[in-house]
Amino acid sequence: MSTFIVVFLLLTAILCHAEHAIDETARGCNRLNKKCNSDADCCRYGERCISTGVNYYCRPDFGP
């Protein structure tokens, strides 16, 4: 049973790392928390490309 858990966690870590590597080169952002490069990128309706201090992410836009 513990071997199954270790294998499952390893596969999860590999998949998460692979998705992160893909997001590094992504220009547009189609889902919440996906990296974007500026306000000109295409976040979903109701989201804006907002700086988190280091990177930009699509976040809900609550108004001006």
Curated annotation (Swiss-Prot):
Q: Found in which tissues?
A: Expressed by the venom gland.
> Where does this one sit in the cell?
Secreted
Q: Does the keyword Signal apply?
A: yes
Its cellular-component GO annotations read: extracellular region
Which keywords belong to this entry?
Calcium channel impairing toxin, Disulfide bond, Ion channel impairing toxin, Knottin, Neurotoxin, Potassium channel impairing toxin, Ryanodine-sensitive calcium-release channel impairing toxin, Secreted, Signal, Toxin
Q: What is its main location?
A: secreted
Q: Which residues form the signal peptide?
A: 1-18
Disulfide bridges in this chain: C29-C43, C36-C49, C42-C58
Source superkingdom: Eukaryota
Q: Which ranges of residues are annotated as propeptide in this record? A: 19-27
GO MF terms listed in the record are: calcium channel regulator activity; potassium channel regulator activity; toxin activity
Q: What does this protein do?
A: Voltage-gated potassium channel (Kv) inhibitor. In addition it may increase intracellular calcium release through the activation of nuclear inositol 1,4,5-trisphosphate receptors (ITPR) of cardiomyocytes, thereby causing an increase in the contraction frequency of these cells.
Q: What is known of its domains?
A: The presence of a 'disulfide through disulfide knot' structurally defines this protein as a knottin.
What family is it from?
Belongs to the scorpion calcin-like family.
Name used for this protein in its record? Neurotoxin lambda-MeuTx
Please report the organism this UniProt entry assigns to the protein. Mesobuthus eupeus (Lesser Asian scorpion)
